[in-house]
Amino acid sequence: MTVRDVIQKIEPRMKKTIEAFQHELASIRTGKATTALLDRVKVEAYGSQMPLKQVGNVGVLDAHTLTVQVWDKSMVGATERAIRDAGLGLNPSADGQNIRISIPPLTEERRKEFVKLTKKFGEDSKVSLRNHRRDLIHEVEKLEKEKLISEDELKRGKKDADDLLHKYEKQITELIAQKEKEIMEV
């Protein structure tokens, strides 16, 4: 096993961290209607908590309105409650088997809360990236102890780990800035 093999093993985990962070960002309100906004909503259905996607179709009606077409009419009330109680500041209204959700404009205070949440998710993702870097360095040091690589290769491996970390941390920082701009846009 070489340093390159270790990097090829760890880098996909770093990419997954970025993807997970992007998914988290998609669920944060910006004032525009997106289906990802309701990704975290869980509905009490048939005795268990189910993701909203498994209870009905979520769609965008216009820039400020989402719709949920609930498949089982008996689930409309529970779905409406779940959306209201999700802590997103949304007030759904049922119309037969369809639920309309108007996305109200964000208050300045709410925008700042969402920016804080974005930064928290970003910091959590950076911690995860640092843990992957630590794992990479640990693997490379193990190879050096087993005399499978030289001391120079160990140093190069550590530098590569740092470079990889900086590359992905930079992506997270850029995503945070982009989301912050979206949130603060009135």
UniProtKB/Swiss-Prot annotation:
Instruction: Tell me which InterPro entries the record gives.
Output: Ribosome_recyc_fac, Ribosome_recyc_fac_dom, RRF_sf
Q: What's the short name of a Pfam family annotated to this entry?
A: RRF
Q: Where in the cell is it found?
A: Cytoplasm
Coiled coil ranges (UniProt) are none
**Keyword vocabulary terms for this entry:** Cytoplasm, Protein biosynthesis
Gene Ontology BP annotations = translational termination
Q: Does the keyword Ubl conjugation apply?
A: no
- What is the superkingdom listed in this entry's lineage? Bacteria
| Gene3D superfamilies on file | 3.30.1360.40, Ribosome-recycling factor
Give the molecular function GO annotations.
ribosomal large subunit binding
Q: Name one GO cellular component term.
A: cytoplasm
Looking up PANTHER family in the UniProt record yields: MITOCHONDRIAL RIBOSOME RECYCLING FACTOR PSEUDO 1 (PTHR20982:SF3), RIBOSOME RECYCLING FACTOR (PTHR20982)
The record's family statement is: Belongs to the RRF family.
* Protein function: Responsible for the release of ribosomes from messenger RNA at the termination of protein biosynthesis. May increase the efficiency of translation by recycling ribosomes from one round of translation to another.
> HAMAP family from the entry?
RRF (MF_00040)
Protein name (Swiss-Prot/TrEMBL): Ribosome-recycling factor
**Highest classification ranks of the organism:** Bacteria, Pseudomonadati, Chlorobiota, Chlorobiia, Chlorobiales
